[in-house]
Amino acid sequence: MDKIKIVDLEVFANHGVFEEEQKLGQKFLVDAVLYTSTRVAGKKDNLEESINYGDIAARITKFLQENTFQLIEAAAEKLAEDLLLYTKGLEQLTLEIKKPWAPVGLPLKTVSVEITRGWHEAYIAFGSNMGEKMGYIQ
């Protein structure tokens, strides 16, 4: 499966457990790996056949700025759900939300959460291979 990557998208948003984090806001960095097929887009040289990473970056920014979460785990989960439902051709994604200004009182580069979510095929079958087969269906 092919990948389109967005690395270190900087978003200023209001997420965190502490009241000050939700009032003042802080910087978050988002990495997104979008799993899709780029074959047709590559052969036709046509953006309509691919996932527009500019649109995805704008959607991530808007989503994180318009919603408030206490945990970056919750932000990642809801953002993944939104992107999967919105994005045509997106089969799976890996999101990492980094919180470089995390208020832990110790020197660190960043704290982050990384999740992978995607679509799964499900099959529904009717009937049985035992007994009165047509009777079960009817």
Can you annotate each of these PLM segments?
Residues 121-124, 133-138:
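Nucleotide and nucleotide-moiety/phosphate-recognizing core
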Residues 1-124, 128:
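N-terminal, polar/charged subdomain of small-to-medium soluble alpha/beta proteins
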